[in-house]
Amino acid sequence: ADIALQNGGGVRIDIPAGEFTIADAFTLLPFSNTLWTVELTGQQIIDSLEEGLANTLDNGGSSGAYPYASGLRFDVNASAAAGSRISNVEINPRLAGSWGPIDVGATYTVVLNNFQASGGDGYNTLGEVTGAGNFVDTFTEYAQGFIDYVENLTEAGLSLQKLPLEEYSTKSYISRAGCDHSTTADCEGY
């Protein structure tokens, strides 16, 4: 896949320090979700990010809908109108090259869990695409996918590490109150 998307609520704990066990993986990712791949245009990806953010911020939303990604990063302005809160979306497919602006007309392969892909947490665009049958179910439980990733790191003599800041999906975050979380340490709330 070019990028991965994840709704925040699908991840239940921080990765513990020290040895990472299979039990930790299933505590981290406790749901019976499988990984699906979906072909999406850049515009559909942006629309999906907006939908996840709207479901986080609006109408008593849930922080579990907040969009996280790998190979994709963006700025968030929660004080902007719904539909225009996500900006400066950049992509680095497979984290194999350099970051550049997403092409709204290009098609990208996205991997994500089946709950989110089916429109869960307000990801309506994803639900429309997959509802039309446009997805591939890998039949890999997402916890198992993470276990495989950790095993591959271990076999290569590496360990889980905190991501470098340039790989964080949220580049900057301005709250509904207009506080810029990326420059002000005492911001409160969404």
Residue ranges and their predicted role:
Residues 1-190:
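Catalytic centers of hydrolytic enzymes
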